[in-house]
Amino acid sequence: MKNIASRLALAATLATTLLSAPIMAQELNGTLKKIKDTGVIALGHRESSIPFSYYDDKQQVIGYSHELMLKVVDAVKADLKLAKLDIKLMPVTSSNRITLVQNGSVDLECGSTTNNTERQKQVSFSN
């Protein structure tokens, strides 16, 4: 469990770095441009993947993965110099999470998705 939490923390840190690096360029493109233009970031979350991402008694998303994504959101907001960045929460499953990232419905998904060669052909991972 400690190893998974450590890997998730590292992934979030690297995701923040990777998402922030293009900001230093003159022109934004891709996901960061979409986020800046719309003022919205879409986070993919699992509904019952305790302790990573799940609903609490009040149907609010909580968990390690969700907290890490919120840290990434804070970094993106600061780097894009946005006064406000709305968060759109989108439930994902093991069956649809890759597709939703590919088609832009989800900007960031942080979970137990295995980083393997086949998936690297489909989406970008942070290590």
Residue ranges and their predicted role:
Residues 21-25:
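Sec/Tat signal peptide C-region and signal peptidase I cleavage site
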Residues 29, 56-79:
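Short, polar/charged alpha-helical segment
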Residues 1-10:
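Bacterial N-terminal signal peptides that target proteins for export
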Residues 70, 82-127:
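Acidic, polar ligand-binding/catalytic clefts
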Residues 36-40, 73-81, 102, 106:
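Sec-exported extracytoplasmic/periplasmic mature domains
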Residues 9-20:
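Bacterial N-terminal signal peptides
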Residues 27-39:
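Short N-terminal segments immediately surrounding and downstream of signal-peptide cleavage
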Residues 40-64:
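Short glycine-rich His-centered loop
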